[in-house]
Every structure is written in structure tokens, then in C-alpha cells.
């Protein structure tokens, strides 16, 4: 008993990635607290991404790297949402649409309780001890975090 053509087309359509939700403004490194009107400027960069931004509900678009070292961090947060930090996204040669067609979305899943200790909507502690040197809530200047992005071909 085969599928009708209409059903097959609908199944193919549903198999394609669908856009979900609205994108928050792209945050530059160190902007999470300031963007939420909070004191300080520490992003708590960890292997899990910008935890403060994730816990505050920020969702940002993934940008395409393609060998460009002027792009920052694209990774998965404690809540498995894609976050992006661009320390130089306002530069004339970068532009806000410099790869906006590539949206990196991590699948939604239940956060690890150990990584989701929340106080006032923000992560109360680092999800992992290996941060980028900014320590516990100490403000740091914006800087680049180089990691390989899908399709980037660089390390």
C-alpha cells in the first residue's frame, strides 16, 4: 500500500529543517550582562558556550566562517541553543549579513541539572571549570575565541 504523491511531498517537506522562533540580536563578546541591563561584562565563556546569555534566553543566529578569522564563537550552550559571539561583527568588511544564510541550531534537549543551576535567571556558577580565563564574574575586555565552525576548514 503506497503513499499518495501528496503525502510523500508533505513528508519530504517536513523532513527539511524548519525555522523556529525569533532571533535575538547578535551579542558581541562581553555583552550579555550589559544587554540585559545588568552590571559587569563577563560572559563566562566555557566549553558550553556563553552560559549567562543562554540562561537569559538569548538565541542568536549562526554565521558562516569560511576561513574568516574575524568571527568569534559558535557553540552549544547549557540549554543546547546555538550562541554566537562576534567581537568584530560591525567591521565594514564583515557586515551583519556575512553568512546569515547559515543558521546553526542545536537540538533542544533537557539541560543537565548540574549545568543549569540558575539564580535570578542567570547561571550561578560555571558549568565547566575550563573557562577562557575570565574567572568568576570578573569583567574582561571583548576578545576573539577561535574555534572551527562547520564548513570553515580552519582551526
Curated annotation (Swiss-Prot):
Top-level taxon of origin: Eukaryota
Region of interest (Disordered), ranges: 130-155
Name by which UniProt lists this protein: Protein FAM201A
Naturally occurring in which organism (per UniProt): Homo sapiens
Gene: FAM201A
Amino acid at each position: 500500500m503506497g503513499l499518495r504523491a501528496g503525502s510523500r511531498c508533505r513528508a519530504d517537506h517536513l523532513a527539511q529543517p524548519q525555522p523556529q522562533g525569533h532571533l535575538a540580536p547578535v551579542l558581541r563578546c562581553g555583552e550579555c550582562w550589559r544587554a540585559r541591563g545588568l552590571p559587569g561584562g563577563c560572559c563566562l565563556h566555557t566549553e558550553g558556550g556563553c552560559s549567562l546569555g543562554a540562561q537569559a534566553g538569548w538565541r542568536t543566529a549562526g554565521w558562516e566562517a569560511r576561513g574568516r578569522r574575524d568571527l568569534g564563537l559558535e557553540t552549544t550552550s547549557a540549554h543546547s541553543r546555538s550562541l554566537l559571539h562576534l567581537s568584530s561583527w560591525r567591521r565594514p568588511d564583515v557586515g551583519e549579513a556575512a553568512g546569515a544564510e547559515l543558521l546553526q541550531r542545536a537540538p533542544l534537549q533537557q539541560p543537565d541539572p548540574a549545568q543549569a543551576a540558575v539564580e535570578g535567571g542567570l547561571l550561578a556558577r560555571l558549568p565547566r571549570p575550563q573557562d577562557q580565563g575570565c574567572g568568576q564574574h570578573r569583567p574582561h575586555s571583548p576578545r576573539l575565541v577561535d574555534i572551527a565552525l562547520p564548513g570553515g576548514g580552519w582551526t
